[in-house]
């Protein structure tokens, strides 16, 4: 049991034939169905169509590879002025790292729901808090049913990767569902 735990090393899976590989969803069949196969996550940085840096990670998600990859580029002095990546790299922890540590760089990384938020369907969805009326002076939201959500407290949450998020908590005033 302890040996198996040691092989896992902060992962959810590993291959019995290649302990360094992690099971990842790969889209290699014609229907693009994601099948779990032992794999690695390759990251490549380019500038002017030349490869300036690369690294291989056991982590299946791009979100958690960005910070170590940027640190490697800083160490190798290969980080360009612009940091360009797709929405798979967009996360609060990545944005905060770039804002705090890489103040001379310009990040061009959309967040995961950016394109959806620009759609007519999203903008007309009354369940989305961003579509509710907000009063900045008194710090409250009004939902489409007229229920008022008042500011309650500042909160912090730390995820399993030790990233702490700061957010505001709102509480609904009494509401009769009938």
Give the ranges of each region predicted by the language model.
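Anion-binding and metal-coordination hotspots
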Residues: 1-178
């Amino acid at each position: 049991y302890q040996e198996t735990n040691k092989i896992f090393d902060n992962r959810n899976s590993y291959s019995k034939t290649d302990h360094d590989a992690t099971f990842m969803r790969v889209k290699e069949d014609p229907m693009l169905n994601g099948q779990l196969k032992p794999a690695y996550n390759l990251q490549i940085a380019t500038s002017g169509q030349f490869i300036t840096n690369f690294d291989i990670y056991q982590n299946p998600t791009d979100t958690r590879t960005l910070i170590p990859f940027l640190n490697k580029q800083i160490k190798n002095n290969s980080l360009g002025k612009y940091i360009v990546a797709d929405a798979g790299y967009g996360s609060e922890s990545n944005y905060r790292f770039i804002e705090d540590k890489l103040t001379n760089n310009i990040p061009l990384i959309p967040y995961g729901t950016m394109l959806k938020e620009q759609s007519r369907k999203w903008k007309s969805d009354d369940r989305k808090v961003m579509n509710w009326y907000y009063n900045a002076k008194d710090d409250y939201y009004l939902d489409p049913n007229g229920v008022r959500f008042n500011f309650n407290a500042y909160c912090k949450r730390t995820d399993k990767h030790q990233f702490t998020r700061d957010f505001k908590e709102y509480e609904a005033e009494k509401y009769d569902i009938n």
